[in-house]
């Protein structure tokens, strides 16, 4: 793998398209590719503002009409094929309605909770039920700890009671009848409805989306108070559950990078918000909000927690940018490779930090400042963004194809499609690919991913192309969701046009108009 992504992806396919095509004597023009240029820092040293930073707007302020889509209708409406990005927006809009998406991002996301009361209208009906849970256990090899937890919260202590081995239905229901909560980990692996929901929402958020399902008997609590490192949407599927939310204990726990340990009641104080969710209701709260939940004494609770924005922060992006900037500096700047002075340990370090007026210490700290200035001239922001996008793709769920998408792609072809210049095609999913241009053109995709989190297929989803193909690939990506002719691809060589489309077809990335 070429520089910039070599630390992210260790094993790549060796497949390369359009390398040794016969040009029939035609002389090709040399392809000129604009590479990402490092962006310099505006200050020589990091500056910390005394004013609080305002949250970055995640969507434009302009309010647009978005059709609301029920989660039971994912993949079975006209938007599923017309433009899956619009469908994804519609699914989120349906979840948070009557709040509109622009207001959600402006007022709630990453800031405070949102409670949506449906007044008894269970819009999630039949999405996932107790019977669905039972069938999942019976039809799949699910294991305790890996796929299923049985827990209880007794005398202010969480207790996990997982046996070893397979989670047989009889064992799970035995623990449930004894007052334990049942947690299904990554149910999208085994249930298509949950897979469709998570896969669709990851299209909207453009980062990983996961889920857990919780079944709690009447009058029980399965987990101690804690906060998570993800933003969560609680969808109450059956029964009722009382939720208590508590403010972060200090500023360092606002939007945390890691989940907390279990808290005692004394550590969290009184809740600032308490609500009982009924079937059809929704509750959103950001990462860092301390929470606990208990089912009423007269009814069980079944809910799904949909989570997102794990390790998807400015800090994560800047970390990748700085790491790559340091690699570049070590490669290109002699000063970064020079040895440290023998006496640096006598002047640098916490025990020497109070030697403010020491000339030798000042000389050494000034040197660090000079190197920081040079590092600031080498910030490869676009490479860092590519690394973030590629990591998301390799961790993401594969797309759930509609019947029409299967019918018009390699997924359902009994015989291989013969691609011609007049063939019209388009990407199946625009957000399922990422084009990275370095010494070659690399198209990453998630079509080969499995439904198990962090597990890709036998090989990561990668197709390599020559630089002559870059404009064609950009044209294909930018044209989505419109169909385009193979003959109209911006490549001089006609055979190479066919090669590009064939490569995408064989990887299951495109569908044909007819």
Swiss-Prot record:
| Alphabetically ordered keywords of this record | Chromatin regulator, Dioxygenase, Iron, Metal-binding, Nucleus, Oxidoreductase, Repressor, Transcription, Transcription regulation
Q: Where is the composition biased (Polar residues)?
A: 44-53
Catalytic activity as recorded in UniProt = N(6),N(6)-dimethyl-L-lysyl(36)-[histone H3] + 2 2-oxoglutarate + 2 O2 = L-lysyl(36)-[histone H3] + 2 formaldehyde + 2 succinate + 2 CO2
**PROSITE patterns according to UniProt:** JMJC
Domain JmjC: where? 180-327
- EC number(s) given by UniProt: 1.14.11.-, 1.14.11.27
Q: Which family does it belong to?
A: Belongs to the ROX family. NO66 subfamily.
* Official protein name in the record: Bifunctional lysine-specific demethylase and histidyl-hydroxylase NO66
């Amino acid at each position: 793998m070429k520089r910039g992504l070599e630390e992210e992806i260790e094993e790549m396919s060796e497949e390369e398209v359009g390398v040794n095509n016969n040009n029939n004597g035609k002389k090709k023009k040399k392809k000129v590719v604009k590479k990402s240029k490092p962006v310099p820092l505006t200050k020589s040293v990091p500056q910390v503002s005394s004013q609080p930073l305002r949250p970055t707007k995640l969507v434009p302020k302009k309010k647009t009409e978005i059709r609301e889509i029920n989660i039971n209708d994912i993949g079975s409406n006209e938007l599923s094929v017309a433009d899956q990005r619009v469908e994804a927006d519609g699914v989120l809009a349906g979840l948070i309605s009557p709040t509109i998406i622009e207001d959600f991002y402006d007022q709630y996301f990453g800031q405070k909770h949102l409670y949506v009361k449906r007044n008894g209208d269970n819009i999630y009906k039949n999405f996932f039920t107790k019977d669905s849970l039972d069938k999942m256990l019976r039809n799949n090899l699910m294991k305790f700890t890996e796929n299923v937890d049985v827990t209880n919260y007794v005398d202010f202590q969480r207790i996990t009671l997982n046996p070893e081995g397979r989670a047989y239905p009889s064992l799970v229901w035995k623990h449930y009848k004894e007052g334990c909560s049942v947690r299904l980990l990554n149910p999208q692996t085994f249930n298509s409805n949950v897979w469709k929901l998570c896969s669709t929402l990851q299209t909207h958020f453009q980062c990983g989306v996961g889920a857990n399902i919780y079944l709690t008997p009447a009058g029980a609590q399965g987990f101690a108070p804690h906060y998570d490192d993800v933003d969560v949407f609680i969808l109450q599927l059956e029964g009722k559950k009382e939720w208590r939310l508590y403010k972060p204990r200090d500023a360092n726990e606002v939007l945390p990078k890691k989940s907390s340990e279990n808290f005692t009641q004394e550590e969290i104080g009184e809740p600032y918000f308490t609500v009982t969710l009924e079937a059809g209701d929704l509750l959103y709260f950001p990462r860092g909000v301390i929470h606990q939940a208990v089912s009423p004494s007269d009814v069980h609770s079944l809910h799904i927690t949909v989570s997102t924005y794990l390790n998807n922060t400015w800090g994560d992006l800047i970390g990748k940018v700085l790491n790559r900037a340091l690699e570049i500096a070590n490669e290109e700047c002699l000063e970064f490779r020079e040895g440290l002075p023998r006496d640096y340990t006598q002047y640098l370090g916490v025990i020497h930090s109070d030697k403010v007026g020491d000339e030798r210490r000042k000389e050494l700290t000034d040197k660090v400042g000079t190197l920081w200035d040079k590092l600031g001239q080498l910030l490869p922001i676009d490479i860092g963004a590519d690394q973030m996008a590629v990591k998301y793709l390799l961790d993401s769920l594969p797309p759930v194809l509609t019947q029409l998408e299967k019918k018009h792609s390699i997924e359902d072809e009994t015989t291989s499609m013969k691609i011609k210049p007049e063939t019209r095609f388009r990407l199946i999913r625009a957000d399922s690919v990422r084009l990275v241009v370095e010494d070659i053109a690399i198209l990453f995709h998630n079509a080969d991913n499995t439904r198990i989190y962090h597990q890709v297929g036998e090989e990561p989803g990668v197709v390599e192309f020559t630089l002559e193909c870059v404009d064609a690939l950009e044209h294909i990506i930018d044209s989505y969701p419109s169909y385009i002719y193979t003959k109209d691809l911006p490549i001089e060589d006609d055979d190479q046009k066919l090669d590009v489309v064939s490569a995408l077809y064989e990887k299951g990335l495109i569908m044909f108009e007819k």
